[in-house]
């Protein structure tokens, strides 16, 4: 297990999500009014999804950087973020000769459903199938996948169910494959509190609240999930614009309701979800990452290491790194992606 030290961004001690939520509530009576640290300057050019392609149920908006014949890396963002999590990572990888694809997930940015009749489905198998559909549309037989949050889950699923399509994997918070059956089981009270937003979305009030206060809600999640990340207003606004997608709220609410068994998926994904419910091992070369100040719910590395049965390394990013390592520690994330591709090419290697 490796530790990567990042220059500290704050002298504040890391607090878990629960502590930050309760502190904000006690201080002001309103979680949205949690104090924000002094912002850092935004100097990174935006990552523009200037390409569009029909892929499965979607017309996917994506950025495409680097040489057309370079080794392909697909970078997958999470909720409630967007492709600009990779605004520094993607150009650095492209400069090293990789072809880098960064798509907006369904319900984000310029990605749209091709039919008004398609269910606005956020179940994990659907999101992962979007990655395969994109690869097929772009005629990409194999790629290295890297992601965090929802993006890491999709990358995990693709690596588990379609290993022949994956050269290597970089997954923040490791093994995130689960099932509705697991989601129905109650957790200890402290763990349940960390998932407060999931239960909020299970209510009509939660859907209405997220619809009305999407940007405020997203900012609160950013602050809670990365309590020592000094993002500024411009950085947040650049990503928040992607949440104005007309299908965003529906996708997010369905995703979290599905996890609890409160919403059904689509029949065409049922067989995939049955496979995922067996918690399949991931055999492709993998580097997992965790930030030492991740305030979002996440598993401990020792709990999931055994799910990766191929070449494997784990890295902890120290120095106040939270839930969004590619944006909070881009150089270290770039190195992890490069090293994962090297694991894939090596005959021997780590386990």
What positions do the PLM features span?
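Flexible "cap/lid" subdomain of the alpha/beta-hydrolase fold that forms the substrate-access gate
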Residues: 34-47, 58-60, 65, 72, ...
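Catalytic histidine-centered segment of alpha/beta-hydrolase-like enzymes
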Residues: 321-329
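Conserved HGGG/HGGXW glycine-rich cap/lid loop of the alpha/beta-hydrolase fold
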Residues: 64-113, 304
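Hydrophobic residues on the short alpha-helix immediately C-terminal to a glycine-rich phosphate/catalytic loop
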Residues: 89, 158, 336-340
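Conserved acidic functional residues
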Residues: 78, 149, 327-328
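Short, amphipathic alpha-helical "lid/cap" segments that border enzyme active or binding sites
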Residues: 128, 253, 330-334, 338
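Alpha/beta-hydrolase fold catalytic core
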Residues: 2-6, 12-13, 18-21, 28-72, ...
């Amino acid at each position: 297990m490796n530790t990567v030290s990042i220059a500290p961004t704050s002298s504040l001690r890391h607090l878990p999500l629960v502590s930050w939520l309760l502190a904000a509530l006690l201080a002001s009576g309103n979680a949205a009014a949690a104090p924000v640290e002094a912002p850092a300057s935004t100097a990174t050019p935006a990552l523009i999804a200037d390409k569009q392609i029909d892929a499965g149920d979607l017309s996917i908006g994506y950025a495409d950087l680097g040489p057309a014949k370079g080794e392909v890396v697909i970078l997958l963002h999470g909720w409630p973020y967007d492709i600009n999590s990779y605004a520094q990572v993607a150009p650095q990888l492209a400069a090293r000769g990789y072809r880098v694809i960064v798509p907006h997930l369904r319900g984000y940015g310029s990605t749209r459903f091709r039919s008004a009749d398609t269910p606005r489905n956020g179940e994990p198998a659907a999101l992962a199938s979007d990655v395969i559909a994109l690869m097929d549309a772009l005629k990409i037989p194999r790629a290295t996948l890297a992601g965090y949050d929802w993006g890491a889950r999709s990358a995990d699923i693709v690596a588990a169910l379609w290993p022949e399509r994956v050269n290597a994997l970089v997954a923040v918070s490791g093994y995130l494959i689960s099932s509705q059956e697991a989601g129905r089981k109650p957790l200890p009270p402290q763990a349940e509190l960390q998932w407060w937003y999931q239960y909020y979305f299970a209510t009509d009030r939660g859907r209405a609240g997220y619809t009305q206060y999407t940007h405020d809600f997203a900012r609160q999640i950013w602050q809670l999930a990365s309590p020592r990340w000094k993002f500024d207003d411009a950085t947040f606004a650049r990503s928040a614009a992607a949440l104005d997608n007309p299908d965003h709220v529906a996708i997010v609410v369905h995703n979290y309701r599905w996890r609890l068994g409160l919403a059904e998926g689509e029949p065409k994904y049922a067989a995939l979800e049955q496979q995922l419910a067996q918690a399949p091992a991931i055999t492709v070369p993998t580097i997992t990452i965790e930030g030492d100040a991740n305030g979002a719910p996440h598993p401990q590395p020792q709990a999931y290491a055994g799910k990766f049965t191929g070449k494997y390394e784990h890295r902890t990013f120290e120095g106040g790194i939270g839930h969004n390592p590619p944006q909070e520690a881009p150089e270290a994330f770039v190195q992890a992606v490069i090293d994962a591709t090297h694991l894939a090419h090596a005959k021997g290697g780590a386990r």
